[in-house]
Amino acid sequence: MNDVAIHAALTIYEERPSGSAVYLRVFYDGTATGYNGHVDLGTGIETALGQILAEELDLPLASVRIELGHTLSTPDQGPTIASETIQIAAIPLRLAGAQARAYLAAQAALRLNAPIADIEFREGVVRWGDHSCTFADLLQGQSVALLLDRSSIVKNPSDYRIVGQKAGRRDLPDKLRGAHPYIHDVDVIGMVHGHVIRPPYAGRDSGAFIGQSLISYGEDAVRAMAGFIAVVRHGDFLGVVAERTDQAQAIAEALPVQWHLPPPIEGMENLRDTLKAQPSTPRALDSSGNFARGIGECDVTRTRTYLWPYHEHGSIGPSCAVADWNDGNPVVWSGTQNPHMLRGDLGVLVDLPAEQIEIRRYQAAGCYGRNCADDVCGDALLLSRAVGHPVRVQLTRAQEHLWEPKGAAQLMEVQGGLKSRNLHAYAIDTWYPSNRGPNLALLLTGRISPEPRTSDMGDRTIIPPYRVPHKHIVVHDMAPIVRAAWMRGWHRFWTAKSRAAAPRR
């Protein structure tokens, strides 16, 4: 087969303000690659998305490859949260598969002089009766690009042969053998090692002292230590670079540093009162019916208050990243769950267009929401820019647990009632102090201001899934008290069930 035929492919893409977003490429040899901007956090989406694409293309699962979270090739589909990969992010991939199959079927019908309805796909070969042709025959050495048609007709689930059937997780064999490459295993030619020195305001990301607390450090005291390459400072960001990771940590621990101490956090011993007293802005999500009237019509009522404390991820492995400044075209190896958002943050950090930064996503130790995976990418990139080499940074366990955005504390006041044994009225007010955990390097360097920010969170599952005539659902948006971001919503599964299970008065 000639070189032209070998490079032939059918591409399904979408135009966006930021450029073309490719969802699928079908190749001459009967294989296909799907592109999805989400990442696998241990849920097996690589296999699941492969099944979806193989189903629509009528290809064997082994002939389908899925590329996840690589900013150079995958579309920006937002963060990998909840179950949105299959519910939302898989939709254009499924449509692209259906569209590609329809295109190839139409080409085969012309080539074989056959009714398009009688065209069959088997193992990457297109057949009509005793006649057949390959994808290479249909592509004829051409690269074809089609705009995604969101009206493409996908398969009826009753015709599924792959989706819904058992399939071995592609990632598990190597993981079970200890051969799977995690972010901690990345080793780049010329790589050196960094270690960061955090300020004394651990776990805080708002206040006038953020980025303004470093008084001095004594580089002369450590310059002669084994492996020393550099000390790097930007505002309150302070790190060292050395030839080996153990040398970097030893130098960081020996470096004399003087800080201004932050003001204490008041009121954490009584978290309920502290949350209630914080400045907040109420945001009504559902005020259908008339709750005041409805609760008065109830035969049975309940009023409960629930306090959810701060939680940490407690990941089995501290966050790690490798960054290569690469002469102003950075490449970052990361365990992030938000590769495209991370790319934007890093662009702000080093004053580059986001599109000029490449994020290569590797699986990490995992978390239940936002942890330090993005922070450590900023650390590594600042150090790499300073020394001109790829730099690996891995936090210590203490740094990880002290600085990770905690699952936000939450106060929930719930009232509800039954009328004739049916849900009739339900109200919940919740206070949720979070700002989504801005990238720490942006704050420490002063690239973004540290004033308290509110974020419209705390509402993900707050509206009950039941029919309730009278509702009053309110989130009180508030700035964080300590560094906090998302960690698994509990509204629906905890407050609603707790209210239902409460003893009668």
Regions picked out by a protein language model, each given a short descriptive name:
Residues M1-R505:
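Cofactor-binding beta-sheet edge motifs in enzyme active sites
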